[in-house]
Amino acid sequence: AYFEAMGLPGLKMLEELLPDMPKDIPVILDAKRGDIGETQKYYAQAYFDRMDVDAVTLNPFMGYDILEPFLDRPGKAVYLLAVTTNPGSVDVEQQVLANGRKVYQLVGDMVTRSIAENSATEVGMVVGLTNANSQILTDLPDAPLLVPGLGAQGGDLSALTGGTRVAPPTINVSRGILYKDPELSFAEKAEKWAKLIREALAL
């Protein structure tokens, strides 16, 4: 969104920036796209073919078919919005259905289905630290998690400790590195957060 806010010059900047990223560092595009299949097909081409990013976030609330154009890409990943960091997560994602399940568990079902169908693309979920808890993690399948909410949003890493999950989480810190502790370099701030994460998760 920050690139799109600048219009075409911003998108050009993004396109020029991506090739400069170190090849051993995965690039996750937080696009949160979710549209009908024909439109999603072109989003998949834009992100995985033209931009060649490693992973993208998707909004799954239109149904499983919005995933399908992204699922034939070996070496790529998608993360489905399950429990996001915003307060409004309780308005939809955490609502209880008539059968007692939560809406976010339907997202988990999509991940389970993609695994059962041997998707070439790895499929995981977005679970924000500000709303995460042991029950949510228990309710969701043991698949990779993209975990925002640490840093500026004040998420608590203890929400990820304990339990029996094996799939690795990818823990994101953005504004906590970009804008906090101006006396430190970006590298120093990144190392500081990496150390906190390692210590909290006993890595």
Where are these regions (language model features)?
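N-terminal active-site wall of soluble small-molecule enzyme domains
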Residues: A1-R50, N131-Q135
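Active-site beta-loop-alpha junctions enriched in small/polar residues
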Residues: A1-Y2, K32-I36, F61, V83-T85, ...
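A general structural detector for well-ordered alpha-helical segments in enzyme core domains, enriched
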Residues: G10-L17, Y43, Y47, V107-M110, ...
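Acidic (Asp/Glu)-rich catalytic clusters
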Residues: L14-K23, P69-P74, T138-L140, L160-P168
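Short beta-strand/loop segments at the ligand-binding rim of alpha/beta enzyme cores
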Residues: P22-K32, S119-G124, P141-V147
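Conserved anion-binding
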Residues: A31, D35-V126
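A C-terminal functional module that forms or caps the active site or interfaces directly
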Residues: M125, L129-N172, G176-I177
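C-terminal helical cap(s) of enzyme catalytic domains, especially alpha/beta-barrels
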Residues: L160-P168, I177-L203
